[in-house]
Amino acid sequence: MEGSWAISFGMPSKPPRFWQDDVAATRSRLAKGKFLSVSVVATPEPGDTIDEVASDYARCARWAADSGADGVEANFSCPNVSSVDGQLYLNAADAGLVAARLREAIPDKPLLLKVGHFTDREVALAFFEAVAPYVDALVMVNGVSTCVRDEQGELMFEGRCRGIGGVAIRDLVFEQLAWFAGFIRERASSVRLVGVGGLGQAADVAQALGQGCEAVQFATAAMLNPGLGLAIRREGF
């Protein structure tokens, strides 16, 4: 489908000191009033317990805050990896434990969690109830994981699942946003939503905000058009 991507680069990272310096440099160059959100994720080692994974998340969040982040976005999903950090949002108990540790690490900073696609509304609700006491916002949807075939029907990427982004997932994103907006409304929760995934034009921004989103992020759309956000802000929606 035109305008859609099969994303396969995982979550590579430089050593912590490198990105800590980068965050500090970025913060020093931002104009007053700009909000710097830094995305962090754990790096699980083979055999790590969920408590050890939570400690790594918390450590990275504290590093980000100490380096100048105004808020921290913890990545609980990556559709291109099979490790626990990439699927954390699908395990409500583990997600709640990690969210609690993150909140302890950065008690005075906004905490956002980025999640992937839920296929089951009850699983989504269990996740929401587990993390809602600890977070300020949820960011969704971080791609849809599926196998990809070429024009001849042959599996690509050695049959491994990849994250699909772009136009192909837009309807799924709005459906999931509607679920979570309902959870928030029914429980009078203060958790806010940030829309991402499949959004690439002014009309998408308007629809996401109309469904209760506090803000909208661009991912693959901004790779194709780095000036997209500025253009929408300038021209309105």
Regions found by a protein language model. Name each.
Residues S13-R17, D51-A54, R170-F174, A202, ...:
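Electropositive phosphate-/nucleotide-binding environments in soluble metabolic enzymes
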Residues P79-L90, F127-S189, A231:
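Glycine/Thr-rich beta-alpha phosphate-binding loop at enzyme active sites
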